[in-house]
């Protein structure tokens, strides 16, 4: 299958402009750059069986009976090897990057800063995974791969470097960097929850839900008080509390 993914970039070397004359004594390079483009991915999984998920195939199986031969052995037939999706297409992402590069003192001090934004859509996903809308087990096959899902990711990246010599035989280069990024699931084809906070849409990828620590049970008197709550079922649903146990909010 074919796809077209255009992209482009521009740059402005500010240090070469006339108004920067005289700065070359301390400024080696100053460049502003930006790029924007559409990229595609056809990676579905690490399994070779999924490489052609848009094509239906069949395989031999003994799940269907077509009678027996003269020796009493059953004839095996064909069964669906997968449920294909002929409309499956590329997973796409629109990417924006804006950056600034600078170097000083004959390239000894370098600096780079970037802002990046990615809007990923038509995400290839299998509805049978996790809490997505899939087929019931009685079907005997996983739901087909589809293009469903939108995720935004953005962040900043900084790095600064210094290089120099110690004597004639030793050269060093120091280059620390800092990156901060946040993603957000804008849409996921998932089941409906009675408790909306369990939904993945609107949250970060692989965001975990955990109980928040409040305090430890001080003594038996407090434990008895907590265990008597909610009509005797206890403050927490997973068993009685004892001195030293954790109490969650």
Residue ranges with predicted function:
Residues 188-190, 224-227:
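Short coil/turn segments at secondary-structure boundaries
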Residues 227-229, 233:
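Structural flexibility/helix-modulation signal
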Residues 218-221, 225, 249:
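Alpha-helix N-cap recognition
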Residues 13, 202, 219-220, 244:
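Helix N-terminus capping/helix-initiation residues
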Residues 1-212:
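Extracellular/periplasmic, surface-exposed regions of secreted and cell-surface proteins
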Residues 141, 170-172, 238, 242, ...:
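Short, small/polar-rich motifs associated with maturation and membrane association
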Residues 201-208, 234-244:
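Glycine-centered loop/turn motifs
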């Amino acid at each position: 299958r074919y796809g077209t993914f255009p992209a482009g970039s521009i740059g402005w070397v500010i240090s070469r402009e006339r108004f920067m004359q005289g700065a070359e004594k301390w400024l080696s390079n100053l460049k502003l750059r930006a790029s924007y483009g559409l990229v595609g991915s056809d990676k579905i999984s690490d399994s070779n069986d999924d490489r052609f998920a848009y094509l239906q195939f069949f395989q031999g199986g003994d799940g269907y009976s077509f009678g027996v031969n003269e020796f009493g052995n059953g004839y095996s037939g064909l069964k669906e090897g997968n449920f294909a999706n002929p409309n499956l297409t590329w997973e796409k992402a629109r990417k924006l990057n804006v950056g600034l590069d600078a170097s000083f003192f004959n390239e000894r001090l370098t600096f780079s800063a970037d802002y990046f934004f990615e809007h990923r859509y038509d995400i290839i996903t299998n509805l049978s995974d996790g809490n997505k809308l899939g087929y019931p087990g009685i079907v005997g096959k996983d739901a087909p791969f589809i293009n469903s899902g939108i995720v935004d990711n953005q962040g900043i990246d900084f790095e600064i470097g210094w290089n120099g010599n110690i004597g004639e035989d030793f050269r060093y280069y120091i280059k620390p960097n800092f990156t901060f990024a946040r993603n957000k699931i804008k849409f996921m084809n998932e089941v409906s929850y009675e408790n909306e906070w369990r939904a993945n849409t609107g949250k970060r990828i692989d965001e975990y839900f955990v109980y928040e620590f409040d305090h430890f049970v001080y003594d038996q008197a407090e434990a008895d008080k907590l265990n008597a709550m909610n009509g005797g079922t206890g403050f927490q649903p997973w068993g009685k509390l004892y001195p030293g146990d954790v109490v969650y909010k």
